[in-house]
């Protein structure tokens, strides 16, 4: 289908984009990579009268280090995450997980900020950002504010990002030495959303788990942080029984929507399997 008619705007700065959002209000949508918005427009699920293309704003791109924090511009594309020496060295989970997102063509256009701001539970970066304890810098008419990933996602297509705000950057603490990490994603084919997915970041002290973050993809209206799974592992020995207990805790909070990828029972069971796989893979990487 052909999208409805719209007016096109191409601001050159974040301030200009924010001003346009304030002027045009709910009739406007930001255009990043376009892989989520444009299909919705073709199906008439979204019918904005104005598109604000933020691809020409240089400050929204790039990856840099600020002390122990990695700063990623919201318009940074997936392939830049994969190829970045900074991300490979300091946040290898993001570099590896980006390879599992969609296909090469999409990874050349799709942006990390767009994936997050869209608020779809099947997108990969919401769970990843929760697992790595990311914070999002948002700019609106009253200046900038920083919000944690944990709590940013309110429901399907619903986030804390206001309609007059632009996501500027993602700030992530670099992994400490010895950190283990993994992202396990079950999908039907290359390019598909996850049937179920799990991101894990952990550290150990001897045979004891000293730090653990678990987040789930596409098994609820939002990405989920698994606090119950964390409590079953933190400060405890890493055993088969502890891993199973964490998986059981994840299963208990799943509320997946039924679709062509499977019914609720199947997706819930697969979430438990992804948790176990991710925990074991992350533990094996702990130094």
From Swiss-Prot:
Comment on bound cofactor: Binds 1 FAD per subunit.
Occurrences of domain FAD-binding PCMH-type (ranges): 1-177
Residues given in the record as FAD binding sites: 32-36, 111-115
Coiled coil: none
EC number: 1.2.5.3
Key words, A-Z: FAD, Flavoprotein, Oxidoreductase
Highest taxon of source: Bacteria
Co-factor(s): FAD
Catalytic activity: CO + a quinone + H2O = a quinol + CO2
Pfam family, one: FAD_binding_5
Function: Catalyzes the oxidation of carbon monoxide to carbon dioxide.
Protein name according to UniProt: Carbon monoxide dehydrogenase medium chain
Organism: Hydrogenophaga pseudoflava
């Amino acid at each position: 289908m052909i999208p409805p008619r719209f007016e096109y705007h191409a601001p050159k700065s974040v301030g200009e984009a924010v001003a346009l959002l304030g002027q045009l209000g709910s009739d406007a949508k930001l255009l990043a990579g376009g892989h989520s918005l444009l299909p919705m427009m073709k199906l008439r699920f979204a019918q904005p009268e104005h598109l604000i293309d933020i691809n020409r704003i240089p400050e929204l791109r790039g990856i840099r280090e600020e002390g122990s924090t990695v700063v990623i511009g919201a318009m940074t594309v997936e392939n830049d995450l994969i190829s970045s020496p900074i991300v490979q060295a300091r946040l290898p989970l993001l570099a590896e997980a980006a390879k599992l997102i969609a296909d090469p063509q999409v990874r050349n256009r799709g942006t990390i900020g767009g994936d997050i701001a869209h608020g779809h539970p099947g997108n990969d970066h919401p769970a990843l950002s929760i697992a790595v304890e990311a914070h999002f810098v948002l700019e609106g008419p009253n200046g900038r504010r920083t919000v944690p990933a944990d709590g940013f996602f309110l429901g399907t297509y619903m986030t804390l990002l206001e309609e007059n705000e632009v996501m500027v950057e993602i700030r992530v603490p670099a992994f400490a030495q010895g950190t283990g990490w993994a992202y396990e994603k079950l999908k039907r084919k290359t390019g598909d959303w996850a049937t179920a997915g799990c991101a894990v970041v952990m550290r150990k002290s001897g045979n004891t788990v000293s730090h653990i973050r678990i987040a789930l993809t596409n098994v609820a209206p939002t990405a989920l942080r698994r606090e119950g799974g964390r409590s079953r592992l933190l400060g405890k020995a890493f055993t088969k029984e502890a891993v199973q207990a964490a998986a059981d805790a994840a299963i208990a909070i799943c509320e997946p929507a039924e679709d062509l990828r499977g019914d609720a029972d199947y997706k819930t069971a697969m979430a438990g399997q992804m948790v176990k796989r991710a925990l074991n893979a992350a533990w094996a990487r702990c130094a």
